[in-house]
Regions:
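Short gly/ser/thr-rich secondary-structure transition/capping motifs
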Residues: 44-48, 123-125
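Conserved E/DxxT/N motif and adjacent residues on the DHp alpha2 helix
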Residues: 37, 44, 159
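An intracellular "coupling" helix at the cytosolic face of ABC transporter transmembrane type-1 domains
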Residues: 24-27, 44, 70-75
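ABC-type nucleotide-binding domain
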Residues: 55-305
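Cytosolic ends of transmembrane helices, especially the final helix of ABC transmembrane type-1 domains
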Residues: 10-38
Length: 305
């Protein structure tokens, strides 16, 4: 009887093992189908079958001419509605507006993550639709509020921006992004291991590393979408000063919730329900733009200024 029970137990264990293999195989097949769907999906915007100008962006000027955009064609109000503005090479431009005003959509049209329904977006005076996607996107660096960091060293994560970057270049961009000091405080410095997603770093440290990584691209246009939200105001101000003194040749667009992050911008765009409500310096807008005044004084009362 003991032998029978032992053999039966072994048979049941084997059957259970086979059942698990079958279950895992079924799951793997389903995962493969989903991956295949993603891999075989053609992007809405591509260079396939089109003749593009192999022009490398040199100046970084940006112009929106009567641009309108909807995410769902002919449904609902436009996210951007007849927006026209010109941004000169090297300018520091702040973008302010309430949630849903179209700020992120505005900057997404520059590297052609989306195309406008009407109007034109020009870079260096050329419609972005006429430019090679590769050359256009090589000239634009985008830093989001939440970016991805990978398992590996600090240096390895930074070099995703430029695999050929030297150690000196890494240190230079980290000084601009105000990241060099905290990196050097780690026992292993630039060889410090980062956990998946940057779990062993603070939010502000992750954002500064992502800014440094974007700078390694040596872009002509730099877009920061609320990418210093987790950084204290003193460090935020230091980053802006470094941008002004060391990145005067780069056109900088900064989306910010805190007006203090863009008060010293060359110009500030105020978006309100998809329309460009006003454009000017902080001093001009505080006198003339009701939407800007409302944001400024509400933040001042809350102690953000």
């Amino acid at each position: 009887l003991t032998a029978f029970i032992t053999y039966l137990s072994q048979v049941l264990t084997a059957l259970n093992f086979l059942a698990n293999i079958f279950l895992q195989g079924t799951r793997a097949a389903a995962s493969n189908r989903r991956l295949s769907e993603v891999m075989n999906t053609r992007p809405d915007i591509s260079d396939d079958g089109a003749s593009r100008r192999e022009y490398r962006v040199e100046k970084g000027s940006i112009e929106f001419r009567n641009v309108s955009f909807r995410y769902f064609k002919n449904v609902g109000a436009p996210v951007l509605d007849d927006v026209s503005v010109k941004i000169e090479p090297g300018e520091f431009v702040g973008i302010i507006g309430s949630t849903g005003s179209g700020k992120s959509t505005f900057v997404s049209l520059i590297p052609r993550l989306d195309d406008p329904d009407a109007g034109e977006v020009l870079v260096d005076g050329i419609n972005v639709k006429e430019l090679s996607l590769y050359e256009l996107r090589e000239s634009v660096a985008v830093v989001l509020q939440k970016n991805t960091l990978f398992s590996g060293t600090v240096a390895e994560n930074l070099r995703w921006g430029n695999e050929e970057a030297t150690d000196e270049e890494l240190e230079e961009v980290c000084r601009i992004a105000q990241a060099d000091s905290f990196i050097r405080s780690f026992p292993d410095g630039y060889e410090t291991q980062i956990g998946q997603g940057g779990g062993n770093l603070s939010g502000g440290q992750k954002q500064r590393l992502c800014i440094a990584r974007a700078l390694l691209k040596k872009p002509k246009i730099m877009i920061l979408d609320d990418s210093t939200s987790a950084v204290d105001t003193a460090t935020d101000a230091a980053i802006r000063r470094a941008f002004r003194t060391q990145l005067s040749h780069v056109t900088k667009l900064v989306i910010a919730l805190r007006i203090s992050s863009v008060m010293d911008a060359d110009k500030i765009l105020v978006l309100d329900e998809g329309r460009l409500a006003a454009c000017g310096t902080h001093e001009e807008l505080i006198q003339s733009c009701e939407a800007y005044q409302e944001i400024y004084y509400s933040q001042k009362e809350e102690g953000h200024e």
